[in-house]
Amino acid sequence: MYKPIYIFIGLRYLWNPYLPNFKKIIIILSILGIGIGISSTIITISIMNGFQNKFKNDILSFIPHIIITNKNRNINKLNFPKETLKLKNVEEITDFISKKVIIENKNEINIGEIIGINIKNEKNLENYNIKKFLHTLHSRKYNAIIGSELAKKMHVNINDQIKLIVLPISKKKFLQNDLNIKLFKITGIFSTNSEIDEYQILINKKNALNFLNYNKNYITGWKIKLKDPFILNIQKIKKLNKNFIILDWKTKKGELFKAMKIEKYIMLFFFILILLVSSFNIVISLTMNVLDKKNNISIFQSQGLSRYKIMLIFIILGSTISIVGNSFGTIISIILIFQKDFLNFLIKIFFIDIEIPIEISLIQILTINITFIFLTILSTLYPIWYAIKSTPSRILSDE
């Protein structure tokens, strides 16, 4: 005697040599439906993770996650908001010098942003890959390192000169033509493959203070680098710093951030649809089995098998289909993800010629699998309830 009996019967109902071909096809299609749903969900989420990680590395690693400043963008270092130190998720707080300027060359004019940097603090400049140019940014000469795209726009190269113009804040000074103008020699060009290549100009911090006419101990503000820039409670920071202007990366990248949120909602919608289709497959498969096995169910009941164990038979049947489908889909998705070249080749056939970043999250894969299995098992409840609601005498009398 096979024990436990309900597991043996459930697995026999799933697959045995005497099962009609039509039922085998239904079971195979149910497993394939779940597998395709799982694999498409995992691949899509992995691609979204890749884009999010690329966004974090290519853009958020070069811009401040939070900026604390005032209306004039000119603030005394001694007024540092100490309440900020109480915040969690903060990796680093540093002061900075920054200003938008007009860039002028012989025949070109553009808008850029100067960043005053401390050449002794190389840690914050690692992503720029400018180690070989960094020594040129000493305070004795007005030198600059500019982005590669900006250099192309201005048609300049190393050793060329550019004129930087700072517009005054007040209209009176503007009408009096009281402008800060300085010639800078280009001593390096950086390329980060991000948008900062189009506008950033790195100059020595002391030169930036002199060029912008900042008083002693005055700065533009403080920039905060977060451990995870996607975990951001800007309202809490504003409450702690009521006398300052608080700007976060979402303000600067608002449209892009909204697009990412919309993508997540669309992904959630498709995830729910796939769940519904998978559950529907299980319901159809189990309902057909229940209708076919009505006589068997009545015989089991008349032989003393409890309704609870009859329920377990069909739970075993439904959960096995779900687990096999989930395992199949997960394996296929992981194989495709690791074959990045093949996946990129498929995407390039149907879409444009772009490189798709992919990042696997084992926790997300586990969560997807558990959710699918749990909900598909829940979907077995209706066929099971249908199976046990009738009495054995009524079923057998109908035959």
UniProtKB/Swiss-Prot annotation:
Keyword Cell membrane: yes
Highest taxon of source: Bacteria
A Gene Ontology cellular-component term: plasma membrane protein complex
Keyword Disulfide bond: no
Membrane-crossing residue ranges in chain numbering: 25-45, 266-286, 312-332, 358-378
Pfam families in the cross-refs: FtsX, MacB_PCD
One GO BP: lipoprotein localization to outer membrane
Family annotation (InterPro entries): ABC3_permease_C (IPR003838), Lipoprotein-release_system (IPR051447), MacB_PCD (IPR025857)
Keyword annotations: Cell membrane, Membrane, Transmembrane, Transmembrane helix, Transport
Coarse class of the protein's main subcellular location: membrane
Subcellular location: Cell membrane
Family: Belongs to the ABC-4 integral membrane protein family. LolC/E subfamily.
Name of the protein this chain belongs to: Lipoprotein-releasing system transmembrane protein LolC
